[in-house]
């Protein structure tokens, strides 16, 4: 499901941070994958994801997992429903399955998503991922994200159900986007629960040329490098507005990611670097048809983690 979500959301068009542009409403022929086969060299597992595209709309995806070439379990199906050219609902899995989920989108008069709700009717608070997320805009830019999800917290030596409430305020300064996220724990009436903590975290993103090139989060810095070819996913405007903060994620940048370096200082004061590198093979249009992902953690040996074969 995660692989589908990444590919699905990556079709958001990158036309400027937080800007809305509805010149295109469909999927460009030959620019969105019809099939992705992922294999993991360090295991005997693989995953095949196929996409059902009709009349320029992505209607569904089917994710099938294999072990030693034999299918394991039931294929996972995700369906999208539309009102005109806008996605209004996504359904994950079978209604009777434990991991079944429904996601709904609400739009304002300008066609921007202002509310996103995900419900997992068969999951419990402890292992579920139900939430409500609201988006606020000013001057054509995304300026605030409000998210609330059920969780549990230890209060006076007892585990109690509460709502985790976060407000992320986005401030734009040149190529930097500073996000201050304040988290509180609230009851069903929206009041802050006594005995819980409130904290604020700051993350600074640097975006240049349509690419996220740096993220600073606390003591951790992540830097990104890209090739010079156009990432085909962002060419598709179909799902443009369903992820208003797409520009804060490297997977949705204008060009194709080829390196990610995560740096931090460990408890001994030593600088540690974890490196993810990607080798790409392209078709005649310059779109990736194969991705080989390597990882090197600190001083460990660089190893091949995953191979993706992409068919358009």
Report each predicted region and the residues it spans.
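C-terminal motif of bacterial Sec signal peptides marking the signal peptidase cleavage site
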Residues: 14-16
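Buried hydrophobic residues that stabilize the cores of well-folded domains
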Residues: 19-312
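Sec-dependent N-terminal signal peptides
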Residues: 4-12
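Positively charged n-region of N-terminal signal peptides that target proteins for export
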Residues: 1-4, 18-19
């Amino acid at each position: 499901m995660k692989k589908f979500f990444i590919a699905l959301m990556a079709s958001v068009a990158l036309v400027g941070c937080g800007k809305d542009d509805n010149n295109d409403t469909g999927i460009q022929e030959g620019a969105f994958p019809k099939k992705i086969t992922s294999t993991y060299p360090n295991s005997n597992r693989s995953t095949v994801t196929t996409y059902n595209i009709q009349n320029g709309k992505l209607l569904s995806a089917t994710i099938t997992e294999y072990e030693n070439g034999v299918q394991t379990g039931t294929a996972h199906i995700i369906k999208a429903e539309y009102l005109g050219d806008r996605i209004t609902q996504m359904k994950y899995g079978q209604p009777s399955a434990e991991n079944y989920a429904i996601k709904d989108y609400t739009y304002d008069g300008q066609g921007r998503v202002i509310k996103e709700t995900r419900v997992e009717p068969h999951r419990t608070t402890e292992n579920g991922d139900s939430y409500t997320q609201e988006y606020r805009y000013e001057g054509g830019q995304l300026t605030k994200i409000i998210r609330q999800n059920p969780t549990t917290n230890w209060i006076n030596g007892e585990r109690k159900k509460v709502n985790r409430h976060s407000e992320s305020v986005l401030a734009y300064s040149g190529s930097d986007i500073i996000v201050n996220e304040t988290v509180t724990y609230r009851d069903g009436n929206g009041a802050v629960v006594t005995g819980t903590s409130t904290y604020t975290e700051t993350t600074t993103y640097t975006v240049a040329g349509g690419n996220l090139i740096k993220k600073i989060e606390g003591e951790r810095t992540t830097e990104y490098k890209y090739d010079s070819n156009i990432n085909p996913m962002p060419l598709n405007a179909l799902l443009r507005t369903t992820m208003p903060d797409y520009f804060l994620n490297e997977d949705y940048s204008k060009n194709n990611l080829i390196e990610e370096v995560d740096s931090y200082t460990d408890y001994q004061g030593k600088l540690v670097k974890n490196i993810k590198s990607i080798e790409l093979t392209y078709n005649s249009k310059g779109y990736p048809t194969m991705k080989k992902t390597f990882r090197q953690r600190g001083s460990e040996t660089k190893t091949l983690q995953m191979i993706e074969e992409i068919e358009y």
